[in-house]
Each structure stands twice: as C-alpha cells, then as structure tokens.
Amino acid sequence: HLAKMLSGNGHDITVIDSDPKLLADVASLADVLTVEGDSTTFAVLRKASVRKCDLFIAVNHVENDNVVAAVLAKQLGAKKSIARIDNNEYLEPNNKEIFINMGIDYLFYPEKVAAQEVINLLGHTSTTEYVDFSSGRLSLVVFRLDPTSSLIGRELSGFKDDAAQLSYRTVAIARGGQTIIARQDEIFMEGDMVYVIARQDAVKEVMEFSGHSNVEINNMMILGGSRIGIRIATELQDEVNIKLIDYNAEKAYRLAELLDKTLIINEDGRHIEAMLEEGLANMDAFIAVTGRSETNILAAMLAKRMGVKKVIAEIENLDYINLAESIGIDTIINKKLVTASNIFRFTMSTDVQAIKCLTGSDAEVLEFIVKPNSPATKHPIKDMRLPQDVICLLYTS
C-alpha cells in the first residue's frame, strides 16, 4: 500500500524483498523497481542504490531486520532512514537517542499509534474517525448518514445554511467505494461517509446536527490480546470496566499478570454463545483486534447486532474495508493506513505539519505552513487555482 501511494505521487520507488512473488504483486500494482534479496546485506542494499535515495523505509514484519537495514542504509548514503518497530521500550527518550546516534532518523510503532487512535475515538464516540490538526484547534470528524438522517436528499450547501454559526467545512464524501471531493451542489445520500473539518469548539454541535451524539463508555470488551489490545487496556483499565478475551490459554495467563485491573477471559471470540455469556449485549464498546480481519469482522457484526453502541474493528485486508463499513461497523483501524499517514509526511516539504490518509477513501488531508511571499499569499483563497480534486478547508493564523 505504501509503495503504491508513494509511486502515485510521483516518487521513484525501489522495493526490496526476499519473496519474488510479493515483488511481482507489488510491481503489478504500482510503478516501482524491485530488488530481490535480503535487505540486511550490503550487497542487496548496494544493488538497490540506497546511496542515492532520499528516504529509506524499513517496514518489514521482522523488527530486527528493519533496524539493521535502516542503519546500514544510512551508513551507505541514504539521506534519511525510518524503521518500523514492535517494542515500545525503543521509544523511551534515552533509548531513542541511541537509535538516532546509530543513524535511524525515525522509529515507528504502528500498534501504538493505532491503539491511540482507538482511545481517542472512545472519547468521541459520535464520530467514526477523529484526528486533531493545528495543535488541537481543528479536528477531522467522520460520520455515516443513517436512514433517519435529516441530511439525506439535501445539498451540501443546505447543511451549511442550517449550521451557519458553526466553523466547519465538509472535506469529502465516500460513497460506493468512490471518493467525492465535496462541492456545494453535492446531494447527501443514505450510507454516505461524510468527512468534515471543524473548529474544536464546534465539533459537538456539528455531530449533533448530523444526528450523532457521544455516549459514555463504562463497560468495554476487547477481543484479542494483541499489542493493540494490550495498549488499549493498559491505558483505560483505571477508568473503564474492561473484559479482554483471548483464545490462547497461555497468553491469557500472561495478560492476567500484566493487566491487574482488566478481567481476562480465555475464550474463542468466534463462539457466539460464549460471547453472549460474557455479557457482550451489556457493553458500551466492543473492540476487535485479534490480528485476523475475518474474525474481527464477524465479531464486530455480532456486537452491532446485540446493540453495542461503539464497535471498532482492526481490518488489515484493504479489500475488506468498504465491506465492513457497508455492514455498519462504526470504525475501522488499519495499520497500513496508519503507517502510510505517518511515513508519507517524510516525503513532503518540511512545511507539511501533518497528513492523514482517510480510511475508506483514497483522499488525504494535509496541514501545512504557508511561507511568506509564496504564491498562496498573493490571492484570496476563492481565487486560488486549485486542481479539481483539491479543496482548501480551513486556515488558522
């Protein structure tokens, strides 16, 4: 996914992997060069001409390989190197400094970022996606138009008229697997996923106007003792009653020692009767993070059917995302998109402060600083000649 996105933005990409089939699949989807071999060897890195690269990204599933490859690439001449890690200990300030001294510019832990996204969403249950921009002054919120929504059949401009006092702007609409950059004459339809940027003090009113309101989370069930599940439970177990379910008995015992305020249950989340016996219907939130997309989707569907107010599922197969959204799962977490959002900004100008790849959409939201005397400062925003698929949302000064 990352290679496809970067190549689509005009970058020259070389992909290294020891699996020839994987390389063939990547080459069929994106305009990239491929090099077969072990990325932790000098010979393969030299063959890939890392000495000429502006950015080396090590996102293998093996943490040690990523660290070694990123260090070697930097020593061979790469201008910047990034390594995906699985150990939160590496991110502690003193330890992080060691990796910087070794030549790694940025360490990225996708599970930590994904867990934090879930925690943020549990504080804003009315939205299916929530991201802060401009140091918290602006927020991206996403909501689905349910059959009873008063917005269905109305033009986007009508939404603005009724909520004129709100400081917001609609970014895009995801509909039927397609992304529509919002224009004032666009008509809302049932099932639309609507993406809105709003000022922080207007988020609550925007969501209420759209027919969604926050619910308090007191009881929560997590399916899967994965790194994401553990981090969520660790952060929230002092505030929320949590049940964490995992099918592996040995792991369940380890989790019970680690999470002293979380009720750990050794059970298979695919068994409907077992889930109901554990009180699924009484939960305010259900989070499926087993690491298996199919299991997460089925469990999330059951939770929705039982009336759980907030249902979140980790879905790593990108082909399943639109399906999952169409059947009513509130929020999708995808580590590929989380990784892409965090790494993509390293390919941009230093003036880009943040970037978010939208789940269920092929659009991105960028926050950037306008330089003095740049072309953007010489015209009103309405007179800027932006590409057809680009929209200026809000600005702060």
Where are these regions (language model features)?
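Hydrophobic, well-ordered beta-alpha structural blocks that scaffold small-molecule cofactor pockets
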Residues: 1-9, 171-178, 183-239, 244-248, ...
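Segments forming oxygen-rich coordination pockets for charged ligands
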Residues: 115, 119-203, 209
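Long, charged amphipathic helices and adjacent flexible linkers at domain junctions
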Residues: 127-135, 208-223, 228, 349-364
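Short amphipathic
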Residues: 138-147, 356, 365-372
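Short beta-strand/loop turn elements enriched in aromatics
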Residues: 149-167, 372-391
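Conserved small/polar residues in nucleotide/adenosyl-binding loops
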Residues: 395-396
